[in-house]
Regions:
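Short, structured secondary-structure boundary patches
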Residues: 34, 53-59, 135-144, 178-181
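Structural motif
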Residues: 9-11, 32-33, 51-52, 130, ...
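PLP-dependent enzyme catalytic core of the Aspartate aminotransferase-like
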Residues: 170-230
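Short, basic, helix/turn surface patches
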Residues: 61-70, 145-153, 183-193
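Conserved small-domain helix->loop->beta segment predominantly found in fold-type I
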Residues: 81-95, 108-175
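Conserved PLP-enzyme active-site core in the AAT-like
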Residues: 1-98, 102, 111, 117-119, ...
Length: 230
């Protein structure tokens, strides 16, 4: 559609959360450049920092020249000894992402069966690892996030509480007991405390860990009297 209007337009796609979910990437279907974060899908849980740029030679070169200087591009710059972790994480990423997608589908199936609205539905096609569950109340969000946090390998004893965050006009609750701060390929959940009280669940370095997190979120909902099992 874009090129029908302007054939020479440059198309860039922010592919965060979408890498390795489908059999093709945006660059396979016409995007000139795709960008994303290495502490999300493509880092496989091992990359401690960083991002990536991929695409046409022209786009990549222009980005590199902007980062350093024209003519120098990718030939200069520190890698801080991180390259083995980045390469290994990238190698493992497709398998890690498949576990996260299974976890998202499982989450949708569980909460859908209990009468909650989920987006996407368990049977719908997926384009990223994020699963939205509308929990109907602040108490539901709190219980869900406590369950996710209790499954964490780091800070599992912590109880998430809502707090103020820049850019939001309501408080936000977050559960993220991760090895890498901010990593959303690791098991995590968050959302603003406002109607429809939707929590956004994502990640899990393994399918089994994702499943544990979902089951513990359900247990916390049960303990709080917010859900009844059939």
């Amino acid at each position: 559609v874009c090129r029908a209007v302007k054939p020479d337009v440059t198309i860039m796609v922010d592919n965060c959360y979408g890498e390795f979910v489908e059999t093709v990437e945006p660059s396979d279907v016409g995007a000139d450049m795709i960008v994303g974060s290495l502490i999300k899908n493509p880092g496989g849980g091992l990359a401690p920092i960083g991002g990536y740029i991929a695409g046409t030679q022209k786009c990549v070169d222009r980005c590199a020249y902007r980062l350093s200087a024209p003519g120098l591009g990718q030939e200069v710059g520190a890698n801080l000894g991180l390259m083995p972790s980045l390469y290994q994480g990238f190698f493992l990423a497709p398998n890690v992402v498949s576990g996260a997608v299974k976890g998202a589908v499982f989450t949708a199936a569980v909460y859908e069966s209990l009468g909650f609205r989920v987006v996407p539905a368990a049977s719908e096609e997926r384009h990223d690892i994020i699963q939205c569950v509308e929990l109907k109340s602040p108490e539901g969000m709190l219980a869900f996030c406590k369950g996710i946090q209790s499954a964490a390998p780091v800070d599992s004893y912590v109880d998430p509480v809502p707090g103020d965050m820049p850019g939001y006009d309501s408080q936000v609750i977050m559960a993220a007991g991760a090895f890498v701060q901010g990593s959303s390929i690791e098991l995590s959940a968050d959302g603003p405390i406002r109607p429809p009280y939707a929590v956004y669940y994502q990640g899990g370095l393994t399918w089994y860990h994702a499943k544990l997190g979902v089951l513990l979120s359900l247990q916390k909902m049960l303990d709080a009297g917010l859900v009844t099992l059939p």
